[in-house]
Regions:
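Bacterial Sec-dependent N-terminal signal peptides
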Residues: 1-26
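Proline- and Ser/Thr-rich low-complexity, intrinsically disordered segments
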Residues: 23-49, 54-185
């Protein structure tokens, strides 16, 4: 009876170790934009394996792909670093689980300072983005500052970008009055 039990145990061990699952690697942490939708995460596919995904923190919601090697996630609006926000455990054909693979996710929520309205001759105003370190672009933007005289009269959309994320602000430059010369009666 002991021999039969040992044979069964040995068979299970051989099947599990013979169909080993292997850990995957990725860049950690991952950076996503606040309110991003359809963000795809995947591991190398082993055709006979199944995959159990868990998404926690960052307002993340697993949308599609549970059980497969690829999922899509919609992220929330609250910025911050979320340790172990995405986890996957691969199980082989013998239903033996592999090592959990964990991914930290940094949700990046950009904002820009509201400025203006301006008059056509107003001085240059620095543009401030949060978090710092991004780049401002748009009509009238020079070296992360807005120059009303360069932009001219009009309505403008300025964009702040960092790590693939963007936010915009609207800026208005108004025409100043045109006053005629001083005259004497």
């Amino acid at each position: 009876k002991k021999t039969k039990t040992m044979k069964k145990l040995l068979t299970v061990l051989l099947v599990c170790f013979g169909l080993m699952t292997y850990g995957q690697t990725t860049i950690n942490p991952d950076t996503v934009c606040a309110n991003a939708t359809g963000e795809q995460y995947f591991v190398t596919n082993t055709p006979t394996s199944t995959y159990n995904w868990t998404v926690t923190g960052g307002g993340g919601t697993l949308q599609t792909g549970q059980g497969s090697n690829s999922i899509t996630v919609d992220w929330g609006a609250v910025s911050g670093l979320y340790p172990n926000a995405v986890e996957v455990i691969e199980s082989n054909a013998a239903n033996c689980p592999g090592t959990p693979i964990l991914l930290d996710v940094f949700v990046l929520d950009l904002s820009g300072n509201l400025i203006g309205p301006f008059c056509a001759g107003d001085p240059t105003t620095p543009l401030v983005g949060n978090p710092a370190g991004g780049t401002w672009t748009g009509t009238g933007v020079v070296a992360n500052a807005f120059q009303p005289s360069t932009a001219g009269v009009g309505n403008y959309i300025l964009t702040y970008s960092m790590a693939g994320c963007n936010t915009t602000i609207n800026v208005v430059v108004n025409n100043g009055p045109v006053t005629g010369p001083i005259q004497h009666y």
